[in-house]
């Protein structure tokens, strides 16, 4: 099944539902960064969460950043996701591996540890909004749910999952259900929804069983006036790095540092943290940056 994002509503638009499949893009990230099993699960969950949160933004260029900093061996996760369906991300320590947790699952919580989740929403207006919440478990899903309830004050349920085996990632994605104020006033409806979500046995087992996103929506909300939007949005791992951005970053180092690179290394090499792309910068390109800096200083 192709990586995709689908939106739906229920209960006369009082319930908002978004589902995303990220199997291929998570495998792409695993290969790019040489991720271990647990690092793949951690990054895959966070990328799915980023896409789900970005799906409710309005402006075409809107993006959301999720940064997780913990005291576990993984150290940190950074994900950048957009309303346009693109996402990128990396972990600080991609090679970390841990024994399974008490449930026999990949120990993402142990890899992340205790710490904080930082969320930056760039709504597309040039004025980003930031929030910080303490990690609840380090399992990503519970932590992002905690953010939604405390910072956005929206009752939410988030299911995230990544299954990675010897052949790579075979299932990855997530589901976000939000109860809007209109539906939150109906305690019976909220209780029914909570009961069904409590019996949801993970997200990736549903994908492995052949369930599609519409199937999952129907199982949960089919008798609540479910309306699935006809548009299916494709999602993908896509970085925004470029030679121009690399040159711009190098230029900020100043003339002395650039000259030192020319004299000692006859150029420079830069690697994008988000996607692993390696950029070779020649001494001529560095010299051009120095000339630009001199011209700007003279102006």
Curated annotation (Swiss-Prot):
GO cellular component assignments: cytoplasm
Single GO BP term: protein refolding
Pfam families on file: HSP33
Keywords assigned: Chaperone, Cytoplasm, Disulfide bond, Redox-active center, Zinc
InterPro entries listed in its UniProt record: Heat_shock_Hsp33, Heat_shock_Hsp33_C, Heat_shock_Hsp33_N
Signal peptide from the UniProt entry: none
S-S pairs: 239-241, 272-275
Subcellular location: Cytoplasm
TM annotation in the entry: none
Modification after translation, per record: Under oxidizing conditions two disulfide bonds are formed involving the reactive cysteines. Under reducing conditions zinc is bound to the reactive cysteines and the protein is inactive.
Main subcellular localisation: cytoplasm
GO molecular function term, any single one: protein folding chaperone
Entries under PANTHER family matching the protein: 33 KDA CHAPERONIN (PTHR30111:SF1)
HAMAP family xrefs: HslO
Family label: Belongs to the HSP33 family.
Role summary: Redox regulated molecular chaperone. Protects both thermally unfolding and oxidatively damaged proteins from irreversible aggregation. Plays an important role in the bacterial defense system toward oxidative stress.
Protein name: 33 kDa chaperonin
Organism: Acaryochloris marina (strain MBIC 11017)
Gene coding for it: hslO
